[in-house]
């Protein structure tokens, strides 16, 4: 099975303000928005999703941008954002494939209850996030 692109992850200091910017500036539909996480999809006219009076989607569009809160300015520096995030069926095999292709791990593989998570740096410096859902959990869980 090939990897499935989940979203482009942008690290933010103020997630609600950033979601408002993308909604108002680009017409993206805000599917989820909390103080620490937001998901934005294609414009309502392109997906059939209908935004409510506040501009937030009543139905979930395909996610194209995810916003994640960070406190540290270092995490927002070049090389940490954006992060390409993928859902994979076999994280260990995918990590090995990427390491052989020239990537390097950026920290240990983590094993939270919802599945396995790994962060890697591609040879060109871009960050990749991998997520393998735990058996019986939804593949849509956040990295």
Language-model features, listed with the residues they occupy:
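N-terminal beta-strand motif that seeds the catalytic metal site of vicinal oxygen chelate
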Residues: 1-19, 82-84, 134-143
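Conserved active-site alpha-helix within GNAT-family acetyltransferase domains
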Residues: 16-25, 118, 127
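Vicinal oxygen chelate
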Residues: 95-143
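Short glycine-enriched loop/turn motifs at secondary-structure junctions
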Residues: 2-4, 76-81, 111-112
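Short amphipathic alpha-helices within nucleic acid-binding modules
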Residues: 20-21, 92-97
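Conserved short beta-strand elements that form part of the metal-binding/catalytic scaffold
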Residues: 29-78, 127-133
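Short hydrophobic/aromatic beta-strand element in the GNAT-like acyltransferase core
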Residues: 39, 85, 117-119
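Conserved acetyl-CoA-binding loop of GNAT-fold acetyltransferases
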Residues: 24-30, 102-104
């Amino acid at each position: 099975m090939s990897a499935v692109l989940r979203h482009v992850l942008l690290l933010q200091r103020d997630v609600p303000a950033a979601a408002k910017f993308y909604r108002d500036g680009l017409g993206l539909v805000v599917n989820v928005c909390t103080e620490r996480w937001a998901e934005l999809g294609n414009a309502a006219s392109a997906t059939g999703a209908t935004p409510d009076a506040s501009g937030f989607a009543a139905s979930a569009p395909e996610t194209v941008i995810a916003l994640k809160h960070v406190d540290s300015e270092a995490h927002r520096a070049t090389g940490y954002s954006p992060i390409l995030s993928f859902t994979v069926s076999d994280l260990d095999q995918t990590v090995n494939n990427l390491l052989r292709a020239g990537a390097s791990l950026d920290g240990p593989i983590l094993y939270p209850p919802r599945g396995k998570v790994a962060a890697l740096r591609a040879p060109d410096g871009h960050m990749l996030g991998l997520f393998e859902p735990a058996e019986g959990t939804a593949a849509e869980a956040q990295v």
